[in-house]
Curated annotation (Swiss-Prot):
Top-level taxon: Eukaryota
First-tier enzyme category under EC: oxidoreductase
Lineage: Eukaryota, Metazoa, Chordata, Craniata, Vertebrata
Gene Ontology CC, one term: endoplasmic reticulum membrane
Membrane topology classification: Single-pass membrane protein
Any one GO molecular function term: hypotaurine monooxygenase activity
SUPFAM superfamilies: FAD/NAD(P)-binding domain (SSF51905)
Primary residence: membrane
Organism, as annotated: Oryctolagus cuniculus (Rabbit)
Name of protein: Flavin-containing monooxygenase 3
A GO BP annotation: taurine biosynthetic process
């Protein structure tokens, strides 16, 4: 009999965790408070307490070849960026194909998780649940928390003087579902993140006027990148990471700002971030620049104070006759079923080794899956996190001593503050992070060796998209179809757009031949030195 593992939540993190437990011979039981899988991506026409909530028009920001489970590509005919309903269809198909649904207890609320009295010896947990008014408590050998970080809204109303006197409506963006009720209205959106920009641009087609208030600005990227290819298939590459890690900071920063300004000059649109060299996650929105050009959306600084009908901004300008204020101000991280001392979260800092393991526990039998954010997609990240966590729970992998884990956390926090700023402490660099996790479970690629043994594949792996298939190409959990999936990823990306015969599919020339030759030479020298 394998160890019994409680999994909290049946979104993408929960499904990845169930599958990883099964791969390691563990016995998972997943508790899901709703009646379906999907978590964040399961749309509901009203916001539900304790659950993530999305608006009806949400599309993915990662393209299909970059966001799939590593051994389960999206169907060829699925669009590159898909509506939430399409992604939910994929998630459901994955769960059924992998036979995961039978391990899920739906409509079950986890009310508390507490250490067993002999935790220091066994590492076991008491998990208490409620279903249809019935309460139960069971003992589990480990717990994987997969409840996400889009559940508990950050609603800083106390930070806005005069808001309590405002006579219009004010609410968090999680309550927003569709634009119909805002026709002809004047709307202020506070926050320049993905949700704020999506909502503002959608409302701009029906509302009288929309204003976005932002404290610090943001880079705004289009899903459509150079020559019309999906942004992440060109931007999230090992070659880009190689350059970022090895170029002098001044050159790297200059190149980053140049890339961000490639489509339009952010200064001209009042969008320029205060610290443009920080690698904070940019906003993904294809419509915002056009809506600003058309005058239906405008960008303003932080709100200084509210009156009964207006907002006064820090630059002294006023937005008058406001009907609604929507706070797109993000979410906090909370685990109400868990003692606060286990996972400390203050000032946006979560104390977790590699964003997964509470370092102070006597036994490494608790893991948080899916909390980390990066420019990479969530699904492959959670898949790799869950694989490592399952092996740690099983005992195949071990964690470093507490002192070493704490030192690593503090060191990484310093790096995160440098690269992403104080407000982005769960952010991380995608490829570096994924390679680090991959090394723990023996699935990290040896790129120089790959150039010597399979140069065709190596070129695609290094210069092409860092797609999820790379993390099931070798080692434990290897997928036999990974190599072919990598070599055909551009075909699947281009196929749904090939709806009229106009010639052959045009794959991108990823980098100039001279740059390729230089990089290959460096890698081959490294391979010779190593072997």
């Amino acid at each position: 009999m394998g160890k019994k593992v409680a999994i909290i939540g049946a979104g993408i993190s929960g499904l990845a965790s169930i599958r990883s437990c099964l791969e390691e011979g563990l016995e998972p039981t997943c508790f899901e408070m709703s009646d379906d899988i999907g978590g964040l991506w399961k749309f509901s026409d009203h916001a539900e307490e304790g659950r993530a909530s999305i608006y009806q028009s949400v599309f993915t920001n990662s393209s299909k070849e970059m966001m799939c489970f590593p051994d389960f590509p999206f169907p060829d005919d699925f669009p590159n960026f898909m509506h939430n309903s399409k992604l939910q269809e994929y998630i459901t198909t994955f769960a059924r194909e992998k036979n995961l649904l039978k391990y899920i207890q739906f409509k079950t609320l986890v009310s508390s998780i507490k250490k067993h009295p002999d935790f220091s010896v066994t590492g076991q947990w008491y998990v208490s649940t409620e279903r249809n008014g019935k309460k139960e408590t069971a003992v589990f050998d480990a717990v994987m928390i997969c409840s996400g970080h889009h559940v508990y809204p950050n609603l800083p109303k106390d930070s806005f003087p005069g808001l309590k006197h405002f006579k219009g409506k004010s609410f968090h963006s999680r309550e927003y579902k569709e634009p119909g009720i805002f026709k002809g209205k004047r709307v202020l959106v506070i926050g320049l993140g993905n949700s704020g920009c999506d909502i503002a641009t959608e409302l701009s087609h029906t509302a009288e006027q929309v204003v976005i208030s932002s404290r610090s600005g943001s880079w705004v990227m289009s899903r459509v990148w150079d020559d019309g290819y999906p942004w992440d298939m060109l931007y999230v590459t090992r070659f880009q990471t190689f350059l970022k890690n090895n170029l002098p900071t001044a050159i790297s920063d200059w190149w980053y700002v140049k890339q961000m300004n490639a489509k339009f000059k952010h200064e001209n649109y009042s969008l320029m971030p205060l610290n443009g060299t920080l690698r904070k996650e940019p906003v993904f929105n294809d419509d915002l620049p056009a809506r600003i050009l058309c005058g239906t959306v405008s960008i303003k600084p932080n709100v200084k104070e509210f009156t009964e009908t207006s907002a006064i901004f820090e630059d002294g300008t006023v937005f008058e006759a406001i009907d609604s204020v929507i706070f797109a101000t993000g979410y906090g991280y909370a685990y109400p079923f868990l003692d606060d001392s286990i996972i400390k979260s203050e000032n946006n800092k979560v104390t977790l080794f590699k964003g997964i393991f509470p370092p102070q526990l006597e036994k490494p039998t608790m893991a948080v899956i899916g909390l980390v954010q990066s420019l990479g997609a969530a699904i492959p990240t959670t898949d790799l996190q869950a694989r490592w966590a399952a092996q740690v729970i099983k005992g195949t992998c071990t964690l470093p001593p507490v002192k070493d884990m704490m030192n690593d956390i503090h060191e990484k926090m310093g790096t995160k503050l440098k690269w992403f700023g104080k407000s982005e402490t769960i952010q991380t660099d995608y490829i570096n992070y994924m390679d680090e996790l991959a090394s723990f479970i023996g699935v990290k690629l040896n790129i120089p060796w790959l150039f010597l043994t399979d140069p065709r594949l190596a070129l695609e792996v290094f210069f092409g998209p860092c797609s999820p298939y790379q993390f099931r190409l070798v080692g434990p959990g290897k997928w036999p179809g990974a190599r072919q999936a990598i070599l055909t990823q551009w075909d699947r990306s281009l196929k749904p757009m090939k709806t009229r015969a106009v010639g052959h599919l045009q794959k991108p020339a990823l980098f100039s031949p001279w740059l390729k030759l230089l990089a290959i030479a460096v890698l081959l020298i490294a391979a010779v030195l190593v072997f």
